[in-house]
Amino acid sequence: NEKLTDAETKEYEKVKQRVYQISKEAHTANQPLFIDAEESWIQPAIDALADENMALFNKEKAIVYNTFQLYRKDRLDFLKQTIAKGKANGFHVGAKLVRGAYMEKERARAIEKNYPSPIQDTKENSDRDYNLALEECVKNIDMMGLCAGTHNEKSSLYLADLLTKYA
């Protein structure tokens, strides 16, 4: 949440332009573009880039996808907000759902910087939010593209059941 320096702002503008160009090429080629998730302290900038390009290039279908790490406590709500934003602004949401990959690093940084860990307290909570995210996406499948990034058998079977029920 620190203010960027002038040099950092200039660099971020270059990143925005590069992501725009890549998104534009993906749209022209009719190929999906998956923007990967990172650590919580840099994720807001990535989310902003993904949202901006989804709004521009996902008018007819999902081309640009953001990655939602459901091992974070706040990401189910963020997914719901993104879906609402897509509905309100007339764009399809591209959602790649994953559990997450930075658990130890996130917890260590939270201790070091003295803030609450953004990571779910238990694996069961991660599983719960992952499955709730699947349900949210399938219920809104008419305005979504979904990539379910999981090896979890229960979640895969749950997704199959949801698709039978809603899609």
Language model features with spans:
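Positively charged, amphipathic and often flexible ligand-engagement surfaces
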Residues: 1-167
